[in-house]
Amino acid sequence: MTRPPAPAPGRPPFTNPARAVLAVILLGTAVRIVLAATIGLGVDESYMVAVARPVSASYFDHPPLSFWIPAAVAHLGGGMHPLALRLPFILFFAATTWLTVRVGALLFGEQAGALGAVLLNLSPVFSVTTGGWILPDGPLMCFMMATVLALAHALLDPAERRTGAWWLAAGVFSALAMLSKYHAVFLLAGTALFLVTDPERRIWLRRPAPWIAVAIALAGLAPVVLWNAAHHWVSFRFQGGRASPAGVHPLALLASLGGQAGYVLPWIWVPLVVVWVGALRRGPRDPARWLLCCIASGPIIVFTLPSLGGHPGLPHWEAPGYLLLFPLLGAATAARWADGAQRVRRWLLFSAVAFGVLLLVAATQSATGWMERVWPRLATRGDPTLEMLDWSDLRGALAARGLLDRPGLFVAAPGWSQAGKAAYALGPEVPVLCLCTAPHQFGYVHDQSDFLGHDAVIVDRTQGRSAVPELYGKYFAAIDSLGAVELRRDGRPAERLALFYARDFERPYPLQVP
């Protein structure tokens, strides 16, 4: 394994890299715990908690691990408090940070590893959403980085004698990544690309250890395959249908790149792209950088190029690829620091301060909605932080109307995101159905036929006149308005839910569920 040249004389970034990283992990974990306890669940989080039970071998949107975790928390007595549900994901990111340090230290030195981990914690898509929300990205990225660490030991550490054990570890961590999110397939594809293109390490393709690791990794997909085989391969059809081309759209490509830069933060995203391109240019001549590059390139390229066909996708889809570039960025930053570049030090300071300010603004806005009071015009443009507002007032509104104890009553919503919010607010004892054409996992939680003849409360988040009577009129004997409930944030009205009482569910709503 080729290590970088020794740093020039001068004070290194960290006198004690291990202590500095420990401080970053402890501080970051403390901040995430505070945020988890004070800010409600997002749309995706509410949905995942709501459909996690009954426990299933797999789920419509993703492999099962990130659904099993909140189900286990609730079963073990953690209840439905946001902090209890989010805590495992916070701990996953603490582990991801430590693994990033170890990968960077093994390949490029302790200072590089520490700097890569610090920069990782200054990027919102990693430090905030991956680091503290109930999403499959948390366990995915932890196990991806663990796999890369095992591969680095097996392939790039000349002093390593236990290569077979590291290959087995890579297989186990890859299997856990497979249980987390479909992005894990890039671990196998990227490793294969590395072995094929590196002449010195191509010999591993003729040895049993990598193939045993592949078999273990693919075993992680067994629950996914079994569930999909019983449900007409719906997950693969759903995921595969997201990238259907519709001509050539350069602006969509620019929108995708802009979204990625925004989620990572532009002043970190640009250097990540620079070190990635540099590693691509060096190729197999620099095995350490090439290994990271081979695995990172898959998610970045595969989820960016389809945007040229008119589908920008979501900006966090490429994030697992960028994750693996942080050890490279740490190495480049350490080298510039050793050269005495003042711009690097100012850039690090700016990155830390800017991230702190952005986090403070977003967190306080999510909790209080203060920006609308300071700048009322912002309210007319929409507030994305309202997605973090729990619908806790819904339960009180239904209880005040004497509806929660009504036998056989169920709650319905016109979309999976609203159904998720309602289901999380009401708890597992109140059945919630998603009466829409694309209910996602809600289409498998309850069988509509079990509720025929029952009454329902239909919940609709709307700022104007609700279309619920027209939309569902032919499926119920009668639908009457129950008025509205105001969802409050920091004691002030923030959103409005229209409520309807629907009598006698007469026929199932047509779902696009195989």
Language-model segments: residues:
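Transmembrane-helix motifs of polytopic, lipid-linked glycan transferases
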Residues: L22, L87-F108, A146-A150
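Short helix- or helix-capping micro-motifs
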Residues: I25, G116-P124, S174, M178, ...
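Transmembrane-lumen/periplasm boundary regions of multi-pass, lipid-linked membrane glycan transferases
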Residues: L176, L188-A288, I295, P299-S307
